[in-house]
Amino acid sequence: MKEIKFSIPNISKQDINLVGKIIKSGWLTHGKYTSLFEHEIKKFTKAKFAVTVSSCTAGLHISCLASDFKKGDEVIVPAQTHTATAHAVEYTGATPIFADVEYPSGNMSLKKIKSKITKKTK
Protein backbone atom coordinates (compact mmCIF):
# COMPACT_ATOMS: atom_id res chain seq x y z
CA MET A 1 0.00 0.00 0.00
CA LYS A 2 1.31 3.44 -0.95
CA GLU A 3 1.60 6.06 1.81
CA ILE A 4 -0.19 9.36 1.13
CA LYS A 5 1.36 12.16 3.19
CA PHE A 6 -0.30 15.36 4.37
CA SER A 7 1.26 18.59 3.15
CA ILE A 8 3.03 21.40 4.98
CA PRO A 9 0.69 24.35 5.65
CA ASN A 10 1.07 27.34 3.33
CA ILE A 11 0.95 30.39 5.62
CA SER A 12 2.06 33.80 4.34
CA LYS A 13 3.76 36.57 6.34
CA GLN A 14 0.61 38.64 5.84
CA ASP A 15 -1.45 35.87 7.48
CA ILE A 16 0.99 35.68 10.40
CA ASN A 17 0.92 39.46 10.87
CA LEU A 18 -2.87 39.54 10.79
CA VAL A 19 -3.12 36.72 13.35
CA GLY A 20 -0.74 38.70 15.59
CA LYS A 21 -2.95 41.76 15.21
CA ILE A 22 -6.04 39.74 16.13
CA ILE A 23 -4.36 38.23 19.21
CA LYS A 24 -3.23 41.67 20.37
CA SER A 25 -6.78 43.02 19.95
CA GLY A 26 -8.00 40.78 22.76
CA TRP A 27 -10.80 39.37 20.60
CA LEU A 28 -9.97 35.87 19.38
CA THR A 29 -13.62 35.19 18.56
CA HIS A 30 -16.58 37.38 17.67
CA GLY A 31 -14.44 40.45 17.05
CA LYS A 32 -14.38 42.77 14.06
CA TYR A 33 -12.28 40.36 11.98
CA THR A 34 -14.79 37.56 12.59
CA SER A 35 -17.61 39.75 11.29
CA LEU A 36 -15.48 40.88 8.36
CA PHE A 37 -14.62 37.28 7.48
CA GLU A 38 -18.27 36.19 7.66
CA HIS A 39 -19.27 39.09 5.42
CA GLU A 40 -16.52 38.36 2.86
CA ILE A 41 -17.14 34.60 2.74
CA LYS A 42 -20.89 35.20 2.34
CA LYS A 43 -20.17 37.55 -0.56
CA PHE A 44 -17.61 35.19 -2.13
CA THR A 45 -19.93 32.16 -1.97
CA LYS A 46 -23.07 34.17 -2.80
CA ALA A 47 -24.70 32.62 0.27
CA LYS A 48 -27.53 34.17 2.28
CA PHE A 49 -25.77 33.43 5.56
CA ALA A 50 -22.29 32.66 6.86
CA VAL A 51 -21.25 31.81 10.39
CA THR A 52 -17.87 31.08 11.89
CA VAL A 53 -17.29 28.41 14.49
CA SER A 54 -14.44 27.70 16.87
CA SER A 55 -13.15 24.59 15.10
CA CYS A 56 -13.51 22.31 12.13
CA THR A 57 -15.08 19.75 14.45
CA ALA A 58 -17.82 22.24 15.40
CA GLY A 59 -18.39 23.11 11.73
CA LEU A 60 -18.64 19.46 10.72
CA HIS A 61 -21.00 18.77 13.62
CA ILE A 62 -23.30 21.64 12.62
CA SER A 63 -23.22 20.41 9.00
CA CYS A 64 -24.21 16.91 10.10
CA LEU A 65 -27.05 18.30 12.24
CA ALA A 66 -28.24 20.44 9.32
CA SER A 67 -28.17 17.31 7.14
CA ASP A 68 -30.51 15.67 9.67
CA PHE A 69 -28.33 12.59 10.25
CA LYS A 70 -29.88 10.28 12.86
CA LYS A 71 -29.31 6.99 14.64
CA GLY A 72 -29.42 4.19 12.09
CA ASP A 73 -28.15 6.38 9.23
CA GLU A 74 -24.82 5.65 7.55
CA VAL A 75 -22.59 8.44 6.26
CA ILE A 76 -19.67 7.74 3.94
CA VAL A 77 -16.48 9.54 5.01
CA PRO A 78 -12.88 9.41 3.75
CA ALA A 79 -10.62 6.80 5.35
CA GLN A 80 -7.75 9.30 5.44
CA THR A 81 -8.95 12.35 7.31
CA HIS A 82 -8.92 13.90 10.76
CA THR A 83 -10.86 11.92 13.36
CA ALA A 84 -13.26 14.88 13.66
CA THR A 85 -14.84 13.89 10.34
CA ALA A 86 -16.09 10.58 11.71
CA HIS A 87 -16.77 11.96 15.19
CA ALA A 88 -19.09 14.66 13.83
CA VAL A 89 -21.15 11.93 12.19
CA GLU A 90 -21.15 9.88 15.42
CA TYR A 91 -22.31 12.91 17.47
CA THR A 92 -25.63 12.74 15.57
CA GLY A 93 -26.08 9.03 16.27
CA ALA A 94 -25.27 8.05 12.68
CA THR A 95 -22.51 5.60 11.76
CA PRO A 96 -19.47 6.70 9.72
CA ILE A 97 -18.61 4.33 6.86
CA PHE A 98 -15.04 4.66 5.60
CA ALA A 99 -14.17 4.79 1.89
CA ASP A 100 -10.56 4.73 0.73
CA VAL A 101 -8.95 7.72 -0.96
CA GLU A 102 -7.11 7.98 -4.27
CA TYR A 103 -3.52 8.97 -4.86
CA PRO A 104 -2.45 11.72 -5.44
CA SER A 105 -5.65 13.74 -4.88
CA GLY A 106 -6.51 12.37 -1.44
CA ASN A 107 -10.19 12.43 -2.47
CA MET A 108 -12.48 9.49 -1.89
CA SER A 109 -12.61 7.02 -4.76
CA LEU A 110 -15.98 7.11 -6.57
CA LYS A 111 -15.72 3.34 -7.04
CA LYS A 112 -15.18 2.86 -3.29
CA ILE A 113 -18.04 5.23 -2.43
CA LYS A 114 -20.45 3.34 -4.72
CA SER A 115 -19.46 0.04 -3.09
CA LYS A 116 -20.35 1.44 0.36
CA ILE A 117 -23.85 2.72 -0.48
CA THR A 118 -26.72 0.92 1.26
CA LYS A 119 -30.37 1.68 2.02
CA LYS A 120 -29.15 3.37 5.22
CA THR A 121 -26.74 5.74 3.42
CA LYS A 122 -27.50 9.45 3.75
What positions do the PLM features span?
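PLP-dependent aminotransferase-like
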Residues: 65-122
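Phosphate-binding glycine-rich loop
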Residues: 27-74, 88-92, 98-100
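Structural motif corresponding to alpha-helix initiation and N-cap regions
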Residues: 13, 35, 107-110
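N-terminal "arm"/small-domain region of PLP-dependent enzymes with the aminotransferase-like
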Residues: 1-27, 32
